[in-house]
A protein has these predicted regions:
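C-terminal hydrophobic helical "lid"/dimerization subdomain
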Residues: 248-252, 293-348
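Glycine-rich beta-strand-centered segment in the early N-terminal region that forms part
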Residues: 19-35, 48-95, 134-137
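Rossmann-fold dehydrogenase core element
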Residues: 259-261, 273-313
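Glycine-rich cofactor phosphate-binding loops and adjacent beta1-alpha1 units
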Residues: 160-163, 203-284, 347-348
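NAD(P)H dinucleotide-binding glycine-rich loop of Rossmann-like/cofactor-binding domains
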Residues: 91-171
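Mid-domain Rossmann-like dinucleotide-binding core that forms the NAD(H)/NADP(H) cofactor-binding site
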Residues: 137-219, 223
């Protein structure tokens, strides 16, 4: 089969023939029809921020496709089922796994980092790592559901706990932030304020639910948030950038008792405001990582109710042979992509 192989940081991925994997007991072979190019893939291949367990390795952890073959002992699935692939393989034994937070498992084996991933015609995963994909959801949207979409949902639903009426600011309106705006509105936020340094991304955010857009390069951010909240500040700020300065900007806009949820990942240290301010205002700062498997049904419900529309979430569908160009465009934000999706079954 064909697969896009990673040989080292800052080197192009190599599309080559590799042996098709065989499912072992409890495993499933999935024929991949879509795999999203995630920011993590860019961090690994182009920026060299994260190492993989070994090289060469097949990257890609946002996969969706059709079950091709069942390993021994798999009886609750069948060949031909449409499925999405959960990106992490947890240990299943630790206290976090037993409490339903397996996405935080310290032994989580992420596809494309610890074992071969989904930038290939086929992938093998444990049966527990699959979710059924409804017939009315295309594979490319299913691929995004496995990470990009669900990560944003977890941040808004579980961590920010948006239930209705809140004023929410969303910092960074790229792929994750775009969906963060969408879910904040779908969950009932009374007012959603999008913040980004690109006017085109603010316009796009308004198209999926943002009531206001602020460009800090051309407007006074603090003053504008104060105006939009009658001087109170926002109930919740969600940061999708991973930049210390953006984190602090988001925190400054919180009302007393407000909550900041940080989704963006970066390597730089964040300095808290003076404790007199931080404690005195009873501010909360939370990290948000991944999502729980049980949250997928809530996302499906929002889609079926028409509150969430993923039809514009895919910028383009590329072949494996075009993966390096897709990675470049994601890294350079060329054309402000939401997500490029690779279809390994597609040929140039």
């Amino acid at each position: 089969m064909r697969a896009a192989r990673f040989y080292g940081a800052k080197k192009p991925l190599v599309v080559e023939e590799v042996e098709r994997p065989k499912p072992k007991q409890g495993e499933v072979l999935v024929r991949i029809f879509a795999c999203g190019i995630c920011g993590t893939d860019v961090h690994i291949a182009i920026e060299g921020l994260f190492p993989t367990l070994f090289t060469p390795i097949t990257l890609g952890h946002e996969g969706a496709g059709v079950i091709e073959e069942l390993g021994e002992g798999v009886s609750d699935l069948k060949v031909g089922d449409r499925v999405g692939v959960y990106p992490g393989i947890p240990c299943g034994e630790c206290s976090l796994c037993r409490s339903g937070k397996d996405y935080l498992c310290p032994k989580n084996m992420i596809l494309g980092i610890f074992q071969d991933g989904c930038f290939a015609e086929y992938v093998v995963v444990p049966k527990e790592n699959l979710f059924f994909l409804p017939d009315d959801i295309p594979f490319e949207a299913g691929a995004l559901l496995s990470d990009a979409v669900s990560t944003a949902f977890h941040a808004t639903y579980k961590r920010a706990e948006i239930t209705g009426g809140e004023t929410v600011s969303v910092f960074g309106c790229g792929g994750l932030g775009y969906h963060g705006v969408m879910f904040a509105k779908a969950l009932g936020a009374g007012k959603v304020i999008a913040v980004d340094v690109k006017d085109e991304l603010l316009a796009r955010a308004k198209g999926v639910g943002a009531d206001f857009g602020i460009n800090p390069k051309t407007e006074d951010l603090n003053q504008r948030i104060s105006e939009l909240t009658d001087g109170d500040g926002v109930d919740v700020a969600i940061e999708f950038v991973g930049n210390p300065e953006v984190v602090l900007s988001a925190m400054r806009g919180l009302k007393r008792g407000g909550k900041l949820v940080i989704v963006g990942i970066g390597m730089e240290r964040v300095t808290l405001p003076p404790l007199r301010v931080f404690v005195g205002k009873e501010l909360s700062v939370l990290g948000s990582m991944g999502y729980a498997k049980g949250e997928m049904e809530k996302i499906f419900a929002l889609i079926s109710e028409g509150k969430v529309d993923l039809s514009n979430s895919v910028t383009d569908i590329l072949s494996l042979e075009d993966i390096n160009e897709g990675m470049r465009k994601m890294a350079e934000k060329d054309g402000n992509p939401i997500r490029y999706v690779i279809n390994p079954q597609k040929t140039t």
